[in-house]
Amino acid sequence: MEFPTRDGGLLNVGVIGLGFMGSTHLKAYARIPEARLAAVCDPKPRRLSGDLSDIQGNIGGPGDKLDFRDVHTYTNAEELVADPAVDAVDICLPTHLHLPVALAAFQAGKHVLVEKPMALTGEQCDEMIVAAKGAGRVLMVAQVVRFWPDYMAARELVCSGSLGRLRSAIFHRKCAAPAWGRWLKDPNKSGGGVFDLLIHDVDFCQQLFGSPSAVTAVGPEDLENGIDWVLAHLEYAHGAPVIVSGGWHHPRSYPFSMDFTIILDGGTLHYHSLIRPLTLYRADGTEEKLKLSEMDAYEAELRYFVECAQADRWPEQCRPEDSAAAVRTALEMNESRRKKETADKRR
């Protein structure tokens, strides 16, 4: 794959971290004419040579071999951040490193896209937002489910009110514990399975319903042995039960999957990544396979970030304030299951 030099009005992007998500973002940027890959950073010389074939992830195949001949390469994030050829920084590092690198980028006047989860605490998220606004730069968190075609179509139907009131909703996301990246099994670096996986569904609920008033969660937590699974009940003002469930609790042979069932007065929306595209089962007994966007979700996400950065516009479709709220809800889920009590904001 090549990254041709393009002229005029481009956003020059530097990608920090060439693991699974960094590699995924590189593929997407190659399809975005308004962006130019200016720099990459990774501690592994092999990856800086363009050989990403050792990369593993829970979706997709191995990494590619890329052409970095016209790209600045760094082993140190601070050096990339200081590169005057870079307009925006895409941070694909372990979660505990997000805040310091983002702060350095804002201090250098760069726009920032940071992978999910935004950070490990609500306070860290707030600090990042304050720094972005103080620098007058764009900050967006890569919550890709907001751009996933099936989730986008479901959101439009739920929020339009055309199917009536919500009766219940359940979201699943599950896989085996990652066999790559030892840091993922360290809760002080990753936050565990709740932060790695369920943050997507928590954020989607944030987009649909706002922040829950109370969270009750149960589930085993044994990160040393690759087990971190949660079933959580999120309470909202609308009163309908919302369940978020999943994590790492399966053998390595078990494939990654995500699914949801949203029941409304006028019908049920159901999606399963392995077996069923988004389908609407109407109350009148008919069913409909819904028309979806054909654009890859990662490409759509990065196109939106590039558009916002070029216009110096806050990303209202994927606000970092919502990402921070999702982090707080994830923390409440962990607090609830550890204390074996409801985390209730109404108290």
Model feature map: region roles:
Residues 1-108, 126, 135, 345:
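N-terminal glycine-/serine-/threonine-rich beta1-alpha1-beta2 phosphate-ribose binding loop
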Residues 1-7, 35, 46, 88-90, ...:
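C-terminal helix-rich "cap/oligomerization" subdomain common to oxidoreductases
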Residues 1-3, 7, 202-276, 302-313:
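Contiguous beta-strand/loop segments that form the cofactor/metal-binding neighborhood of enzyme cores
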Residues 24, 291-303, 318:
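Active-site loop of classical SDR/Rossmann-like NAD(P)-dependent oxidoreductases
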Residues 108-121:
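ADP-ribose/adenylate-binding Rossmann-like module
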Residues 114, 139-141, 244, 271:
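Hydrophobic residues in well-ordered beta-strands that form the structural core
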Residues 118-138:
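Rossmann-fold NAD(P)-binding glycine/threonine-rich loop
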Residues 138, 145-223, 340:
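Predominantly a Rossmann-like dinucleotide-binding segment in NAD(P)-dependent oxidoreductases
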